[in-house]
Amino acid sequence: MAADEDELNLLVIIVDTNPIWWGKQALKESQFTLSKCMDAVMVLANSHLFMNRSNQLAVIASHIQESRLLYPGKNGGLGDFFGDPGNALPDCNPSGSKDGKYELLTVANEVIAEEIKDLMTKSDIKGQHTETLLAGSLAKALCYIHRVNKAVKDNQEMKSRILVIKAAEDSALQYMNFMNVIFAAQKQNILIDACVLDSDSGLLQQACDITGGLYLKVPQMPSLLQYLLWVFLPDQDQRSQLILPPPIHVDYRAACFCHRSLIEIGYVCSVCLSIFCNFSPICTTCETAFKISLPPVLKAKKKKQKVSL
């Protein structure tokens, strides 16, 4: 029991808040909106914090223009990257003790609700770049985990995992950054779980398979909370005792840099390792010119002229 209390379990939840996808979803199906998705995320966050007093939580919104740390907020200890990580509660909490609710849960709900409201209110869609910055959100999650890990005491063990709640489609433009983040998480023994709401994500399938996490495409979006509590609330030690969804077939095809399409056979630049579906004498990524080796030219043998006597 003492060993479990000394162990720090950090859960970082990344929520896809793409306003274009959620706007289309609200027009198509009013039963499942962003607010209901955030309610399910808050229940999962509260359950994680309530399971052990040493559990830690962070929530990141993956938007089209930024990746914002929703919780801990700006007033929280862990929200400030240069603050005291041991203080996760704000100095004042007027509503935390009125209804007898655990103060940490109340603070988490209030901070997440205020931050997500501020983020969606200030959203200004410009240009054609409307993809979710998922690679940047994963990088921010790894930086946050590293920052908390440095503040952990020497006699305390820390386990970290990342849960991605994905809504919009993958962005092939983020392929290289995404793969770099995946291998960085694997090196740090950080699990990446994925809960996909809409179409399957090949990038997240690879992330879960490489890091040892779970990948689940939700069959019914209004039942999101049930899947979050059933599949993603248990940590990596508890999962071995549960019957979880079976592993899926992972699509390991790479995306070419010229058309951003998945290919099985392609051409790889020997300098920057960019992948192309068609041969090009000059790499469009690093502008390296390749020397094309031509087959050797065989000199024709001179015919011996017969000398007539």
UniProtKB/Swiss-Prot annotation:
UniProt GO MF annotations: RNA polymerase II general transcription initiation factor activity; zinc ion binding
Enumerate the residue ranges forming zinc fingers (C4-type): 269-286
Keyword Metal-binding listed? The answer is: yes
Record-level GO BP terms:
nucleotide-excision repair; regulation of DNA-templated transcription; transcription by RNA polymerase II
Alphabetical UniProt keywords: DNA damage, DNA repair, Metal-binding, Nucleus, Transcription, Transcription regulation, Zinc, Zinc-finger
Location of this chain's protein in the cell: Nucleus
Leader sequence residues: none
Q: Does the keyword Nucleus apply?
A: yes
**Stored Gene3D superfamilies:** von Willebrand factor, type A domain
Q: Which residues form a coiled coil?
A: none
Q: Which GO terms describe its cellular component?
A: core TFIIH complex portion of holo TFIIH complex; nucleus; transcription factor TFIID complex; transcription factor TFIIH holo complex; transcription preinitiation complex
How would you summarize the oligomeric state and partners of this protein?
Part of a TFIID-containing RNA polymerase II pre-initiation complex that is composed of TBP and at least GTF2A1, GTF2A2, GTF2E1, GTF2E2, GTF2F1, GTF2H2, GTF2H3, GTF2H4, GTF2H5, GTF2B, TCEA1, ERCC2, ERCC3, TAF1, TAF2, TAF3, TAF4, TAF5, TAF6, TAF7, TAF8, TAF9, TAF10, TAF11, TAF12 and TAF13. Component of the 7-subunit TFIIH core complex composed of XPB/ERCC3, XPD/ERCC2, GTF2H1, GTF2H2, GTF2H3, GTF2H4 and GTF2H5, which is active in NER.
The family annotation for this protein states:
Belongs to the TFB4 family.
- What's this protein's function? Component of the general transcription and DNA repair factor IIH (TFIIH) core complex, which is involved in general and transcription-coupled nucleotide excision repair (NER) of damaged DNA and, when complexed to CAK, in RNA transcription by RNA polymerase II. In NER, TFIIH acts by opening DNA around the lesion to allow the excision of the damaged oligonucleotide and its replacement by a new DNA fragment. In transcription, TFIIH has an essential role in transcription initiation.
Indicate what this protein is called per its UniProt record. Answer: General transcription factor IIH subunit 3
